[in-house]
Amino acid sequence: MKFTKGYWMNRPGVENADCVQIREIKVQRNRVYLYAVPYAHDTRAMGGPVLELFLSSPKTDIIRIQAFHFMGSAKKDPRFEIELEDLPLNVEEFEGGLAIRSGKTELKITKNPASFTFYYEGKKLTNIGDRFGHAMISTLQTPEGPFM
């Protein structure tokens, strides 16, 4: 990728599949599973990879997001132990999205277009979402292979 015209542009041979819409949400006590696709229209059933986003709270005030595409079963290196308390999440669904809380941290997610906004003690920290038509979470297909 290169940076020109005020935003990142793909080099020749690089295709990206952006996280545009969250199609499905599964809520459990300690985890939230999001399944995102690279298209915005509900009538479309195919046309790109599905990104799996797993949300959990390893410690109070922390919301962990893991993104996967073709998780597979092979063990990846390097590996290291992470201290996880696996705390329950406070999840509140609303029209068009959901809010997830862990202690004083809150994550508000909208489904279409997909966006993620982080708050701490009610103050906005950062957000990830659709900017200038380019999503901030995506998979890349390059001549060297797939990347995320």
Task: Name these PLM-found stretches.
Residues 1-148:
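N-terminal accessory segment at the very beginning of proteins
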